[in-house]
Curated annotation (Swiss-Prot):
EC top class named in words: ligase
Catalytic reactions on record: a 3'-end 3'-phospho-ribonucleotide-RNA + ATP = a 3'-end 2',3'-cyclophospho-ribonucleotide-RNA + AMP + diphosphate
Compartments, as annotated in UniProt: Cytoplasm
Record-linked Pfam families: RTC, RTC_insert
Key words, A-Z: ATP-binding, Cytoplasm, Ligase, Nucleotide-binding
Protein name, as recorded: RNA 3'-terminal phosphate cyclase
PANTHER family: RNA 3' TERMINAL PHOSPHATE CYCLASE (PTHR11096), RNA 3'-TERMINAL PHOSPHATE CYCLASE (PTHR11096:SF0)
Principal cellular location given in the protein's record: cytoplasm
Lineage, opening ranks: Bacteria, Pseudomonadati, Pseudomonadota, Gammaproteobacteria, Enterobacterales
Length: 338
């Protein structure tokens, strides 16, 4: 019998990422875990619908036995079984992030006995989670270099707080993992601005694009009007394609916040990324830790190692026989496997 790993949900940033990473790693390694103080660092601690859906999805895919899988629970015991490929559908029942549920279960399906398709309904444009286009255009091309073949499709948008969106991913078992080397971003090839609107006047998008164009030379400017029943909602994105990597940044519009202020938030975030020679943005760094650990080799550079990143590394090191090195030089941190 494999040893039970005990995790403190309050460590580091104290959010849901500790639970999601633990679920992924438990499914992959077969190691059971207990976590207490789930989301202790949040204003509303314990399992929300999104986290509960991730737990139930993980349990279904690997036939796990679970204790504490209920809304508001701050303690969970997870004993995994064998991961099995298949066609899975999960509903969050709120505007909780579809992509964060997918993020939890897809790594385990890299080790399944056959190809899989996972469909999740809930929120797709959430201010605290990556949109499907980030997964599709930024993360999945990098995963392909590592040896992971998966394809995400956004079937229907669902903005916060209404939800109602649908995202699906097709994924195949990984034959072998490759080392990812992302030391330098390289020169910028082009930048693309994009605005999504659902039940929001078009002039909002035009003002947001104008704000982006006032700060950056945009090779593309796209406005997409979605059906009103997928809103109301508004998301502004800016994609930076460089020689070695494509990064994508986004901001979700808010009621009573002007189009110019929303877009200015995005401008500030992109300028912060471009001010550093680091290849990887803050959020993408979190996403690369697990596949890099599974490969057992690789490195990337990031401007600032967030608390989120360091917490994720700590969880990975509890489950896998790897050690990460974080070395800061001239304002850039190089993250690698020792």
């Amino acid at each position: 019998m494999k040893r039970m790993i005990a995790l403190d949900g309050a460590q580091g940033e104290g959010g849901g990422q500790i639970l999601r990473s633990a679920l992924s790693l438990s499914m992959i390694t077969g190691q059971p875990f207990t976590i207490t103080g789930i989301r202790a660092g949040r204003a509303k601690p314990g399992l929300l619908r999104q986290h509960l859906t991730a737990v139930k999805a993980a349990a279904e895919i690997c036939r796990a036995t679970v204790e504490g899988a209920e809304l508001g629970s701050q303690r969970l015991v997870f004993r995994p079984g064998t991961v099995r490929g298949g066609d899975y559908r999960f509903a969050i029942g709120s505007a909780g992030s579809c992509t964060l549920v997918l993020q939890t279960v897809l790594p385990a399906l890299w080790f399944a006995d056959g190809p899989s398709r996972v469909e999740v309904s809930g929120g797709t444009d959430n201010p605290s989670a990556p949109p499907a286009d980030f997964i599709r255009r930024v993360l999945e091309p990098l995963l392909a270099k590592i040896g992971v073949h998966q394809q995400t499709t956004l079937l229907r948008h669902g903005f916060y707080p209404a939800g109602g969106g649908v995202v699906a991913t097709e994924v195949s078992p990984v034959a072998s993992f490759n080392s990812l080397q992302l030391g330098e971003r390289g020169n910028i090839v082009q930048m693309r601005g994009e605005v999504l609107l659902a039940g929001v006047p078009r002039h909002v998008a035009e003002r947001e694009i104008a704000t982006l164009a006032g700060s950056f030379s945009l090779h593309e400017q796209n406005i997409h009007n979605l059906p009103r029943d997928q809103g109301p909602g508004n998301t502004v994105s800016l994609e930076v394609e460089s020689e070695n990597i494509t990064e994508r940044f986004f901001v979700v519009g808010e009621k009573r916040v002007s189009a110019e202020v929303v877009a200015a938030q995005l401008v500030k975030e992109v300028k912060r990324y471009l001010a550093s020679p680091a290849a990887v943005g803050e959020y993408l760094a979190d996403q690369l830790v697990l596949p890099m650990a599974l490969a057992g080799a690789g490195e990337f550079t990031v401007a600032h190692p967030s608390c989120h990143l360091q917490t994720n590394i700590a969880v990975v090191e509890r489950f896998l026989p790897v050690r990460f090195s974080l070395i800061e030089t001239d304002g850039v941190t190089r993250v690698s496997i020792e």
